[in-house]
């Protein structure tokens, strides 16, 4: 039985802490064997021991902290061919590195589908969506396709991707997000832990967009789900409402703090 992953523990592991900057390839790509050897050299026993606590399969893993993988990726730059080769190894850190090296402009819809079908943890799923997939022109089409999947991590990918687009694509129009709300509503009753948390993430992301219209639609859906007779849908709705309420309160606190500072001058 898979362990429940709290928001706090997810943030501690920090696979999705911020979008990766677009990096040109700065030197010839190493071989897959050389990249594996470098990752193995970065291994940490404590990190390896902790993977299972975050519901990440540890069989064959090296135990490399995510920060170490990111730093190595930054040194290599974009290396799409190497990323594809690393992905084919199936090894955890190799696949994490692949997510940071892959070129969103080069990855094809077929490659996206192939990667997604082989996801075996939320960490790989979210990192691919957050650092590659949301920057492709295929993103919304994949949200619609993957949301219909019965596979737990493919379905999570649909909503992790939707959440990532909501966060990163500041210029995206409202329409594709509004069109995605029925997908959220249908998936909210999926009781599987990683699916329902992905669904909540997507709903919260849409509800935090700058558009008042989107915020209104997202809050209305969250309110409707919170009143559902289905336990999973009710959890998604309540989780989203709590987070959206905090998001509304935060600017008010910031303004109040600013006013206090001004009045004390």
PLM regions with names:
Residues 2-8, 18-265:
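Alpha-helical scaffold domains
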């Amino acid at each position: 039985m898979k362990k429940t992953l709290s928001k706090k523990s997810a943030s501690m592991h920090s696979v999705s802490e911020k979008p990766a900057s677009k990096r040109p390839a700065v030197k010839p790509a190493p071989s897959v064997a050389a990249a594996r050897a470098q990752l193995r050299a970065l291994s940490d026993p404590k990190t390896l021991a902790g993977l299972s606590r975050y519901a990440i399969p540890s069989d064959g893993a090296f135990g490399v902290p995510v920060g170490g993988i990111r730093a190595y990726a930054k040194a290599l730059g974009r290396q799409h061919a190497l990323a594809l080769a690393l992905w084919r190894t199936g090894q955890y850190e190799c696949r994490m590195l692949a997510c940071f090296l892959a070129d969103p402009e080069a990855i094809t819809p077929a490659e996206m589908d192939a990667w997604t079908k082989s996801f075996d943890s939320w960490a790989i799923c979210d990192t691919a969506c957050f650092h590659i997939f949301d920057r492709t022109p295929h993103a919304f089409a994949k949200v619609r396709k993957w949301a219909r999947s019965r596979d737990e991590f493919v379905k999570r990918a649909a909503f992790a991707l939707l959440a990532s687009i909501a966060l990163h694509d500041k210029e995206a129009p409202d329409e594709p997000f509004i069109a995605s709300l029925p997908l959220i509503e249908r998936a909210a009753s999926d009781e599987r832990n990683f699916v329902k948390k992905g669904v909540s993430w997507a709903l919260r992301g849409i509800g935090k967009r700058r558009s008042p219209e989107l915020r209104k639609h997202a809050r209305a859906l969250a309110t409707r789900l919170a009143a559902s007779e289905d336990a999973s849908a009710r959890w998604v709705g309540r989780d989203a409402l709590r987070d959206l309420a905090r998001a509304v309160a935060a600017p008010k606190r910031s303004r109040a703090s600013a006013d206090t500072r001004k009045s004390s001058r």
